[in-house]
Swiss-Prot record:
It catalyses: mycothiol + arsenate = arseno-mycothiol + H2O. It is an enzyme of class 2 (transferase). Keywords: Arsenical resistance, Cytoplasm, Transferase. This is Arsenate-mycothiol transferase ArsC1. It is found in: Cytoplasm. The gene is arsC1. GO terms for cellular component: cytoplasm. It comes from Corynebacterium glutamicum (strain ATCC 13032 / DSM 20300 / JCM 1318 / BCRC 11384 / CCUG 27702 / LMG 3730 / NBRC 12168 / NCIMB 10025 / NRRL B-2784 / 534). Induction: By arsenite. InterPro entries: Ptyr_pPase (IPR023485), Ptyr_pPase_sf (IPR036196). One of its GO terms (molecular function) is mycothiol-arsenate ligase activity. Gene3D superfamilies: 3.40.50.2300. Belongs to the low molecular weight phosphotyrosine protein phosphatase family. One of its GO terms (biological process) is response to arsenic-containing substance. Involved in defense against toxic arsenate. Involved in the mycothiol/myoredoxin redox pathway which uses a mycothioltransferase mechanism; facilitates adduct formation between arsenate and mycothiol.
Length: 140
């Protein structure tokens, strides 16, 4: 039996925040954590500013692509993290894991745009990811 903890990061388009969280989790956890990402309404490509901001901190999401929700995966993972307030997801009744929502910083509400905005979003997600990785891997 595989006791490796697992997490699924979810946002609407799976082109930005959930991909960023997955890349950061892989960077911090390495092989100690199985990491997945998906979107409730997947887009067609990754957000270029997300890619660039993740690369700045030594993580890589360049091989990612927007994907939809896999109901079987949701049932198996230890944690499902919804990023932002927009994505809506209900856990299947027979799911094993815990659902949580991260209402992430949205600098555009303060008039901050472009790469400055994306770096702030990345740093907020990164702090949350580091805490989650520590929590999920402490007993693995």
């Amino acid at each position: 039996m595989n006791n490796q903890p697992s997490v699924l990061f979810v946002c609407v388009g799976n082109g930005g925040k959930s991909q960023m969280a997955a890349a950061l989790a892989k960077k911090h956890a390495g092989d100690a954590l199985k990491v997945y990402s998906a979107g409730t309404k997947p887009g067609t490509k990754l957000n270029q500013q997300s890619l660039d901001s993740i690369a700045e901190v030594g993580a890589d999401m360049s091989q990612g692509f927007p994907k939809g929700i896999d109901q079987e995966l949701i049932k198996r993972v230890d944690r499902v993290v919804i990023l932002g307030a927009e994505a809506q997801l209900e856990m299947p009744i027979d799911a094993n894991g815990i659902l949580q929502r991260w209402v992430t910083d949205e600098p555009s509400e303060r008039g901050i745009e472009g790469m400055e905005r994306m770096r702030l979003v990345r740093d907020d997600i990164d702090a949350r990811v580091q805490n989650l990785v520590a929590e999920l891997t402490q007993n693995a």
